[in-house]
Amino acid sequence: MVRIEYRAHDGRARPAWLLMPEGDIDRPIPLVVSPHDRGESAKENALRWGDLPGEGDFAVIAPAGEGRRLGDYSWGAPGQISDLARMPSVATQHGVDVDPSQVYAVGGSMGGQETLLLVARDPGLLAGAIAFDPATDMARRYRDFRALRDGRWLQRLARVEIGGTPGQVPRAYAERSPDHYVRAIADSGVPLQLFWSTRDRIIRDQRLETGALVRRLRRDHPEARLWVFVGEWRHTAEMRASRRLPRALARFGLLPWADVPQLPRAAGRRA
């Protein structure tokens, strides 16, 4: 795992972590762009991947991100999504021979939110996307922050980053909300895997976020290439090399199924 730097949309130098398979590979390889969730750093997000890049011969780039005003709390800022779309070029500049037909996005929570926004805004970039327990409605997130231990602090950060409350700047919250882009996500043609939990204690009613997004996609766009998995796991717990992440990657051909461990004992269900 190597620390690199890239230039964000606002000109700031930001770190990213690059994971590569070992040894010489004489062909272009797939690249996974992995934005981090709100409660962790880019390095912590990179550590979730374990040895999977080596097992599947693909690279992962995990950028720190950069919002409108804040760094680690980008919450789907338009500039941040533009930066994510540039990650294949960043990886190439740092020696990765990227196969442009095999670029994927994988993220959890805020990273899942940004993964979905990337699908909506730059669909031609991606061969597939995976979102674990994503935030899909930023205005609801702002209101629901109150129920969290550090909720008032998170609301203050959101006002700084987004420019006010949902009542003051509703369009700014909408443009950071995947549920505002249902048609674009469906029309993108990007194969999409969504994972959400009925016992999430961070996004406490995922039925009204990811669940609602799924219902709209299936109702209005039944032809969308969509896999949905529902379980009872802790928030983003399944986005790990030891949990459901390998199965999600194998579904897109990034890992051999023979290398995928058995499902955890408390298996979820397919919706």
Residues covered by each model-derived region:
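N-terminal cap/lid segment of alpha/beta-hydrolase-fold proteins
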Residues: 1-24
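Short substrate-entry loop that stabilizes the transition state in hydrolases
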Residues: 24-29, 34-73, 202
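Cell-envelope and extracellular/periplasmic
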Residues: 36-38, 134, 162, 195-200
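Mobile cap/lid helix-loop segments that gate and shape the active-site cleft of serine hydrolases
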Residues: 39, 44, 140-184
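Alpha/beta-hydrolase active-site loop
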Residues: 75-96
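Primarily recognizes the serine-hydrolase "nucleophile elbow" in alpha/beta-hydrolase
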Residues: 101-148
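Short, proline-enriched alpha-helix->beta-strand connector loops that line the catalytic pocket
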Residues: 185-192
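C-terminal catalytic histidine-bearing segment of alpha/beta-hydrolase fold enzymes
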Residues: 193-195, 202, 206-271
